[in-house]
């Protein structure tokens, strides 16, 4: 009995330690690049500055995909080059995903997007699955 108690206690302590060291997981949802991209990229940079181990996925759809297109710049401040900001965050482990339904609806091609962009069949489904199945927190800048 003493061995069983020791084993259970050791397992509980191990699980507790594992839970404390697990990285946070967050999905940033962007569906309007003009309103959310610059603020969202700044939020992500700050997020990683404070918690660098955080796993971050940026899911875009509708007008949110625009900042991931080749040569995209902030419409309010053309000095802000999205490509450089996205590449810097990608180098820190951030994933950027573009909705393929949006591509079809807007007659866009994958080749029009930054090499840092990945593609997902549905942005909305991807956000839901990251939250429900993979335990990601949700942020909409």
Say what each PLM segment does.
Residues 6-16:
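Bacterial N-terminal signal peptides
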Residues 20-141:
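Secreted/extracellular ectodomain signature
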Residues 1-4:
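Positively charged n-region of N-terminal signal peptides that target proteins for export
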């Amino acid at each position: 009995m003493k061995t069983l108690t020791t084993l259970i206690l050791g397992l509980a302590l191990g699980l507790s330690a594992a839970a404390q060291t697990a990285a946070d997981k967050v999905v940033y949802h962007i569906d309007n690049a003009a309103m959310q991209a610059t603020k969202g990229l700044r939020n992500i940079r700050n997020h990683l500055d404070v918690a660098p181990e955080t796993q971050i996925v940026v899911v875009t759809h509708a007008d949110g995909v625009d900042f991931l297109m080749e040569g995209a710049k902030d419409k309010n401040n053309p000095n802000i080059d999205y490509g450089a900001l996205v590449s810097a965050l990608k180098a820190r482990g951030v994933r950027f995903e573009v909705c393929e339904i949006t591509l079809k609806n807007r007659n866009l091609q994958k080749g029009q997007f930054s090499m840092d962009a990945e593609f997902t069949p549905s942005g909305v489904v991807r956000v839901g699955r990251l939250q429900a199945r993979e335990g990601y927190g949700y942020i909409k800048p």
